[in-house]
A protein has these predicted regions:
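Gram-negative outer-membrane beta-barrel transporters
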Residues: 696-839
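N-terminal periplasmic accessory domains that precede
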Residues: 89-95, 141-144, 168-170, 208-210, ...
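Outer-membrane beta-barrel transmembrane domain signature of Gram-negative proteins
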Residues: 409-424, 428-429, 441, 453-585, ...
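Outer-membrane beta-barrel signature, preferentially recognizing the C-terminal barrel domain
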Residues: 357, 420, 554, 558-569, ...
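Surface-exposed extracellular loop regions of Gram-negative outer-membrane beta-barrel proteins
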Residues: 238, 243-258, 267-269, 355-363, ...
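Periplasmic N-terminal accessory/gating domains of Gram-negative outer-membrane beta-barrel systems
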Residues: 120-169, 177-178, 187-209, 221-228
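C-terminal beta-signal and adjacent terminal beta-strands/loops
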Residues: 4, 701, 773, 829-841, ...
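Short, acidic, small-residue-rich periplasmic hinge/interaction motif at the N-terminus
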Residues: 27-47, 70-78, 86-134, 142
C-alpha cells in the first residue's frame, strides 16, 4: 500500500509540474552533415515525454517546450542526436549519416577518403542494415540484399543439390557467384570450400555471406562495376564490401520468428550486439553473437505437391520380371497393412534446408597515438544444414535392400560448415602518407555426413550412416597500402598504391571406406518373393548382386585417390589515382599486376570519369579489363553425385580437370577468365530529399570456366583413359571443368530514394531496377570433340548461364514512421526465367531438353512496428502477403510425382507471417 501511495504522489507531482511549467518555444534548422542540405521530416521529441514535432520542407522547426531538458532529433538513415535545451531558444542541428564516421568515410570503389556514392565515378549502393533488421521479414544477409538491391540475386540453397543446398550464393548483374568479390571492412574475404553443383552458378565456388552475423553489420556497400584493377581477381561483376559496427555503449538485441501457413518451415533468429569503449582516446570493441534455426519446410503450394503416384513396392527404376506382379492395388494394400499411405514417400524439401546457425564476430580498434591505430576483426561460425534427396522406393532393387529398409528410405545429408577468419592491422601516418599494414586469414570447412542411407552393393553388411569426407579452403592475405591526398594539385589529387601477397589452399579428405566402396562383381542370385510379398535376397549379406549402386546414397564419399592438398601463391601490386581536374571534372585510373604460381602473370586496368554539370546532375563512365583466376577447387575437385533422369538414378562423376581422362579427351588445364567492361551513367540529387542514379553496362567475358555436359559410359568412341575412369568409379556419366564458353552481359540499372514529410511522419521511399540480358557468344570445342558440341556446353548449362536468373528485377520499398509506429510496404518484381530440363540422353551427342518459361511474379511484404519506448520496438508482418508462387514444374518433366513449385526466381516459401523484437539497452 505504501508503494502505491508513493507512486500516486510521484505521478501527481509530475502531472502538476507539467501543467504549471512555463511554456517556451524552441526553433531552428536541421541539416545533413554530408552535403549541408536541409532535412525535411526529421522527428523531434522532448526526451522523456510524448511530445514532439517534425521539421518542415526547408528543414526548419518550432516546438513548444513545457518541460524537459533535452530534445532528441532522429531521421531514417542518420544518427540520432540529443541536444540539451539549457535556456537556448534557437538551434542549428547537424545530423551525421548513419554508420559513417565522417573522419573516416570509405566508399568501395574509391580510395579517396572523401568520396561519396553520388560523386563516385562508378555505381555504388550503400545499404543501411538497421532499419531492415527492425522492419523487414528477412534476417540473413543474402535475403536482406535480395529484397533491397535490384542487381543482387540469391535464393536459398541456390537451387543446388547435395552440399550446395546449404549455401545461398551471391550474384551481381546475372553473372556467376565467383565473378563478384567480397570484402569485409575493405579487406578481401575467403571463399567457401564447396563447389556448387546442379543449381545457379553450377560449377562455381562463392562466398558464404550468411556466415557473417547480420546484427554485426553497420552497412553494406555494393560496387556495381568491374574492379579487378583495384581489388584483384573475381571483381568482374562488382564488389560487395561489408562494413562492421563500431558503436559502443549500446547493447542491442534483435529476435525474430516466422512460420509458414501450414505450420512448417518455422524460423528463429536472435542477435545480440554490444560495444565497449577502450580507454579514453576512441578505442572500441564491438561483438555480436547470433543463433538461428530453420525447421523443415514442405513443398509450397498445393497440399499434394510432390506426391508420388508411381509403383512403390515393384516396377522400380530397374524393372525386372517379378515387378510385373505389382499393381497399384497391391501397392495400396501393402501400404494399408503397414499403416502408411503415399504421403509417407513425399519429398521433404520445400525451400531452405533445416538446420541451425551459431555465429560470432567482433570488430575492434585502438589508437596508439594521435596518428596511429591498431585494428582487428573476425569471427567464427558453425552451421548445420540437412538436405534430403529423392526417396529410394522399396521397389528400386538396385538402390535399396529390403531387409534394411522394407519401405525404402529417404537419405539425409548433413553438412557441418565451420567458417573462421581473423584480420589484424596497423594504420597511421608516415609523413604525409596514410599507411595500412594488414594480414587477413580465413578458412572454410565442409564436412559431409550421410544418414538413413546405405551402400546397396554391400548387402546387409552396409552401414546406414557414413562419414563421406570433407573439404577445406583457406586464404591468407598480407597487404601494405599507401595513400595520400594532394590538395594543391589542380583541385585535388588522390594517389594510392600498394602490394599484396596471398596464399590460397584447397584440401579434400577421403570419407570412410563404405561411403565409396563397391563390392566385387559376383554371380547374381535369385530373388525370392515368398516372404510377405516383399522381395529380398535369399543369400543377402553373403553374396552381393552385380550392378547394385555403390557408395553412400545421396552423396558418395570422397575416394582416397581423390584426396588432395594443394596451394598456390599470388603476388600483386597496384596503383590507383583520382584527379579532380576542376571542381566539376573527376578522372581516375588504376592498374594492377598479379603473378599466380600456377599460371603466371595477369595485368588489368581501369579508367573512369565523372563530370558535374550542376549540383543536381553528374555524368559518369568507366572502362575496365578484369580477370578471374580459376579456383583451386575447380582444378582439383572430384566427386560423384546421384541425379535422377527420367525417374532413374544415375551416378554422375565430376572429374578433376587435372586428370588423365581430361587430357585424353583434349580438355586442357584451366586458364583465367578475362573480361572487358564498360559503363555509362548519371547521378542526380534535384533536391535535398531525393537521389537518382541510372547506369548502363556491357561486360564481355572470355573463356568462362564451367562444367561440361555429361559424357556417358556407353559411348564406345571415348578414349581408354575415360573408360577406365568409369570402371574405377562405377559412374554412368562424367563431366569436367573447362574454359568452355564466352558471354556478353548488357543491361541498365536504376536506383533512387525519396524522403518526405507526410502528415507529421517521415516517408523514406527506395526504388530500383535492373534490366539485363546474358548471351553465349562462343563455345570452345576441343579439337577432336566437334561432334560433342552439345555436350561441351549442354543446353541445361547454357540456360543456367543465360536465362535461369530473372532478366528484370524491380525493387520498391517504403518505410513510413509516424509517432510510435513504423510501417513497411515492399514489393519486388522477379522477371521471367526459362529452364532447360533433360528429357532423354538416348543419343549422348544430342541430348533432348524440355524448355519451360516461368512467368514473372510480384512478391509483396508488409509489416507494422510499434515503438514502446525509445529503446524497444516490436514488429509484426507478413512475407509474401499475397502468397505468390512461381510456376509449377511442367507435368511432362515432373515424372511420377505431382509437380512442385520451381523456386528459381525467389525461392518457394509462399506466405510467411513473422514477428520481430528490437531492444537497445
Amino acid at each position: 500500500m505504501k508503494k502505491i501511495i508513493l507512486l500516486l504522489i510521484f505521478f501527481s507531482l509530475a502531472y502538476g509540474q507539467n501543467i504549471f511549467a512555463q511554456k517556451r518555444t524552441v526553433s531552428g534548422i536541421v541539416t545533413a552533415a554530408d552535403d549541408k542540405a536541409p532535412l525535411p521530416g526529421v522527428s523531434i521529441r522532448i526526451k522523456g515525454l510524448n511530445e514532439g514535432a517534425v521539421t518542415k520542407a526547408d528543414g526548419t522547426f518550432s516546438i513548444v517546450v513545457r518541460n524537459g531538458k533535452y530534445l532528441v532529433f532522429s531521421f531514417l538513415g542518420y544518427e540520432s542526436q540529443e541536444v540539451e535545451i539549457d535556456g537556448h531558444k534557437e538551434f542549428n542541428v547537424v545530423l551525421k549519416p548513419a554508420g559513417n564516421d565522417l573522419n573516416e568515410v570509405q566508399i568501395v570503389g574509391s580510395r579517396n577518403a572523401n568520396r561519396t556514392k553520388l560523386n563516385s565515378a562508378s555505381a555504388v549502393d550503400v545499404i543501411d542494415i538497421k532499419p531492415l533488421l527492425e522492419s523487414a521479414p528477412q534476417t540473413s544477409v543474402t535475403q536482406l540484399l535480395q529484397y533491397i538491391s535490384p542487381s543482387f540475386h540469391s535464393v536459398n540453397g541456390s537451387n543446388a543439390g547435395d552440399a550446395g543446398s546449404a549455401l545461398s550464393l551471391a550474384q551481381l548483374r546475372g553473372l556467376g557467384p565467383d565473378q563478384v568479390l567480397v570484402l569485409v571492412n575493405g579487406k578481401r574475404r575467403h571463399k567457401s570450400a564447396n563447389v556448387n553443383y546442379g543449381g545457379l552458378g553450377n560449377g562455381s565456388t562463392g562466398y558464404d555471406l550468411n556466415s557473417i552475423p547480420a546484427g554485426s553489420i553497420d552497412r553494406i556497400e555494393i560496387l556495381r562495376d568491374g574492379a579487378a584493377a583495384q581489388y584483384g581477381s573475381d571483381a568482374i561483376a562488382g564488389v560487395i564490401n561489408i562494413v562492421l559496427k563500431k558503436k559502443t555503449d549500446d547493447l542491442s538485441v534483435n529476435t525474430s520468428g516466422s512460420t509458414r501457413r501450414r505450420g512448417d518451415g518455422a524460423t528463429t533468429r536472435t542477435s545480440v550486439n554490444y560495444g565497449v569503449g577502450l580507454g579514453n582516446t576512441g578505442g572500441y570493441i564491438n561483438a555480436t553473437a547470433e543463433y538461428a534455426t530453420q525447421a523443415i519446410a514442405l513443398p509450397a503450394g498445393r497440399a499434394d505437391a510432390g506426391l508420388y503416384n508411381g509403383p512403390i513396392y515393384g516396377g522400380g527404376a530397374n524393372t525386372r520380371g517379378y515387378d510385373a506382379i505389382y499393381t497399384k492395388a497391391i501397392d495400396d494394400a501393402i501400404l494399408a497393412s503397414r499403416g502408411i499411405n503415399r504421403h509417407f514417400f513425399d519429398q521433404r524439401g520445400g525451400g531452405a534446408n533445416p538446420g541451425q546457425d551459431a555465429l560470432l564476430s567482433f570488430n575492434a580498434g585502438f589508437p596508439l597515438n594521435k596518428t596511429t591505430d591498431i585494428y582487428a576483426f573476425g569471427g567464427i561460425s558453425s552451421r548445420n544444414s540437412q538436405f534430403t534427396a529423392v526417396y529410394r522406393l522399396p521397389g528400386w532393387t538396385s538402390r535399396n535392400n529390403n531387409f534394411i529398409y522394407p519401405d525404402g528410405f529417404l537419405p539425409d545429408m548433413e553438412n557441418n560448415i565451420v567458417d573462421g577468419s581473423i584480420a589484424v592491422g596497423i594504420k597511421g601516418k608516415v609523413g604525409d602518407w596514410n599507411v595500412d599494414l594488414s594480414n587477413v586469414f580465413g578458412k572454410n570447412s565442409f564436412s559431409n555426413r550421410v544418414d538413413n542411407s546405405l551402400n546397396a552393393s554391400l548387402g546387409l553388411k552396409s552401414p546406414t550412416s557414413f562419414d563421406a569426407g570433407r573439404y577445406n579452403a583457406g586464404q591468407n592475405t598480407t597487404g601494405l597500402d599507401f595513400s595520400r591526398y594532394f590538395e594543391k594539385v589542380l583541385k585535388g589529387l588522390n594517389v594510392a598504391f600498394g602490394a599484396q601477397h596471398r596464399i590460397e589452399s584447397f584440401q579434400i579428405i577421403a570419407g570412410e571406406e563404405g561411403s565409396y566402396s563397391k563390392a566385387d562383381q559376383r554371380t547374381i542370385v535369385d530373388v525370392d518373393t515368398t516372404t510377405g510379398g516383399i522381395p529380398y535376397l535369399s543369400n543377402a549379406g553373403v553374396t552381393s548382386l552385380n550392378g547394385l549402386a555403390a557408395g553412400s546414397q545421396i552423396h558418395l564419399g570422397f575416394r582416397p585417390e581423390n584426396a588432395v592438398n594443394v596451394s598456390r601463391s599470388i603476388t600483386a601490386g597496384y596503383a590507383d589515382v583520382e584527379l579532380n581536374v576542376t571542381k566539376a571534372w573527376l578522372i581516375s585510373g588504376a592498374g594492377r599486376a598479379e603473378y599466380f604460381s600456377d599460371f603466371g602473370n595477369v595485368f588489368t586496368w581501369k579508367a573512369a570519369t565523372r563530370y558535374s554539370f550542376a549540383r543536381w546532375l553528374n555524368i559518369r563512365g568507366s572502362a575496365n579489363t578484369g580477370f578471374r583466376a580459376p579456383d583451386l577447387a575447380q582444378s582439383y575437385y572430384t566427386s560423384i553425385s546421384t541425379t535422377f533422369q527420367q525417374g532413374k538414378g544415375v551416378d554422375i562423376l565430376t572429374a578433376s580437370n587435372q586428370s588423365a581422362a581430361a587430357r585424353a579427351l583434349g580438355i586442357p588445364k584451366l586458364t583465367p577468365e578475362k573480361s572487358k567492361g564498360y559503363a555509362l551513367g548519371l547521378t542526380s540529387a534535384p533536391g535535398s530529399n531525393i537521389e537518382l542514379t541510372v547506369d548502363a553496362y556491357l561486360i564481355d567475358i572470355d573463356n568462362r570456366v564451367g562444367n561440361t555436359g555429361n559424357f556417358t559410359s556407353t559411348d564406345v568412341n571415348l578414349p581408354a583413359d575415360v573408360k577406365t575412369l568409369f570402371q574405377q568409379t562405377g559412374a554412368a556419366q562424367a563431366n569436367f571443368f573447362y574454359n568452355e564458353f564466352s558471354t556478353r552481359t548488357k543491361g541498365v540499372e536504376f536506383t533512387g530514394s525519396y524522403k518526405v514529410l507526410l502528415d507529421k511522419g517521415n516517408l523514406n521511399f527506395l526504388f530500383g531496377g535492373n534490366f539485363s540480358k546474358n548471351e553465349v557468344t562462343k563455345v570452345n570445342t576441343p579439337k577432336g570433340l566437334e561432334a560433342y558440341k552439345n555436350v561441351i556446353l549442354s543446353p541445361g548449362e547454357r540456360a543456367r548461364v543465360t536465362t535461369n536468373i530473372p532478366a528484370q528485377k524491380i525493387n520498391l520499398q517504403g518505410i513510413y514512421s509516424v509517432d510510435k509506429f513504423t510501417f513497411l510496404l515492399r514489393t519486388v518484381y522477379f522477371g521471367k526465367v526459362t529452364t532447360a530440363s533433360l528429357v532423354s540422353a538416348a543419343d549422348p551427342l544430342n541430348p533432348v531438353y524440355f524448355y519451360q518459361n516461368l512467368k514473372p511474379i510480384w512478391v509483396t511484404d508488409l509489416s507494422v512496428g510499434y515503438r514502446f519506448t525509445a529503446k524497444l520496438q516490436a514488429t509484426a508482418g507478413v512475407n509474401n502477403v499475397f502468397n505468390i508462387l512461381g510456376d509449377y514444374t511442367d507435368p511432362s518433366i515432373a515424372g511420377l510425382r505431382n509437380p512442385t513449385v520451381v523456386g528459381i526466381q525467389n525461392g518457394s516459401a509462399g506466405i510467411q507471417p513473422f514477428i520481430k523484437l528490437s531492444a537497445h539497452l
